[in-house]
Amino acid sequence: MRRFFYTHSRGVTEVVVGRGIPYDKYVERPVVLIEEGLENPLPNAPALALKGGEGVKSLEALSKVYVFLQEAEADRGSTLVAVGGGALLDLATFAAGTYMRGIGLVQVPTTLLAMVDAALGGKGAVDWGLVKNLVGVFYQPKAILCDLEWLRSLPPRVYRSAFAEVVKYGLALDEEFYSWLRQSTTALLNRGEDALEEAVYRSLKLKASVVEADEFEERGIRQVLNVGHTVGHALERVLGLLHGEAVSLGIAAELRLSAELGYLREKYVEETKSLLKAFELPTEAGLSSEQLAAAKGLIKYDKKRRRDYVYLPLVIRPGKWILERLRVEEVARAVEYVVPQGRTA
């Protein structure tokens, strides 16, 4: 069992990574929001089960959570315990941060992607129309409990997809971690306990350091967490991919853009694509002309856009990055880099 703490505007969050975590130790007056099909780790607490997946990040689902909290007589001394994947954790963060202007929140991520991404950061959101995370809040949890036991039964494709986010942390923030990942792909794909704990712990430590430095995205530092996500989010919507698969494509495209702009050496583009492929993640995708146009069109709705420009985090070498102001059309063209040899289907 490994743990650390990070500080923020609401105080301190405890992060625990290990197996067999005693959940009741970390919550007071719990009410549970849980993904359908999962076993409630706090069976004596009131619970609402919702279907997981991106569809849960809706105003309709948010309304159901508010009704549940009201019927459970939750107040500002209650703790909403969110048990599930990243989409459900996003919804829970939004609900906890807005119900009665804020109640307690504990995150229990049950997928690898949720552990290394959605659980930490304090972002809660719902989708609006075709745009991901358009309506949201910043609201930090009291604790994040990453029990690796949840990952034993995770479907292989879902499990593998999370490594796009893990690679992102090493690629953009920590060259030594990036090198460790290149040496540890087999152990991680085999769900080796020690390697998995190390990957989750180090990913969270890196993300926490960024959140501490720029909790509300006011200084530009937190933009590094969006490496691969500008192109990735557009492709996720158009192709219906898992989030991690789309981020993998986004990383490949944005690295190519960085190289074309003269920031990144070609060897790192190919080296990182090889690492993503080692985790059985895509770096190319066939798109029809209509899909390509749709993906490009979605770039203009990206939250990093300011008028005619997108502020894009670009990796310049493993562990180093810059924030570059690029025209929307220039970033949109980067979508083409994931199409094999620039051809559309």
Curated annotation (Swiss-Prot):
The keyword Metal-binding applies. CDD domains: DHQS. Zn(2+) binds at residues 165, 229, 243. It is an enzyme of class 4 (lyase). Binds 1 divalent metal cation per subunit. Can use either Co(2+) or Zn(2+). GO terms for biological process: amino acid biosynthetic process; aromatic amino acid family biosynthetic process; chorismate biosynthetic process. It is found in: Cytoplasm. It catalyses: 7-phospho-2-dehydro-3-deoxy-D-arabino-heptonate = 3-dehydroquinate + phosphate. GO terms for molecular function: 3-dehydroquinate synthase activity; metal ion binding; nucleotide binding. The keyword Nucleotide-binding applies. Its EC number is 4.2.3.4. Pathway: Metabolic intermediate biosynthesis; chorismate biosynthesis; chorismate from D-erythrose 4-phosphate and phosphoenolpyruvate: step 2/7. NAD(+) binds at residues 86-90, 110-111, 123, 132. One of its GO terms (cellular component) is cytoplasm. Pfam families: DHQ_synthase, DHQS_C. Catalyzes the conversion of 3-deoxy-D-arabino-heptulosonate 7-phosphate (DAHP) to dehydroquinate (DHQ). Belongs to the sugar phosphate cyclases superfamily. Dehydroquinate synthase family. PANTHER family: 3-DEHYDROQUINATE SYNTHASE. This is 3-dehydroquinate synthase. It comes from Pyrobaculum aerophilum (strain ATCC 51768 / DSM 7523 / JCM 9630 / CIP 104966 / NBRC 100827 / IM2). The lineage of its organism: Archaea, Thermoproteota, Thermoprotei, Thermoproteales, Thermoproteaceae. The gene is aroB.
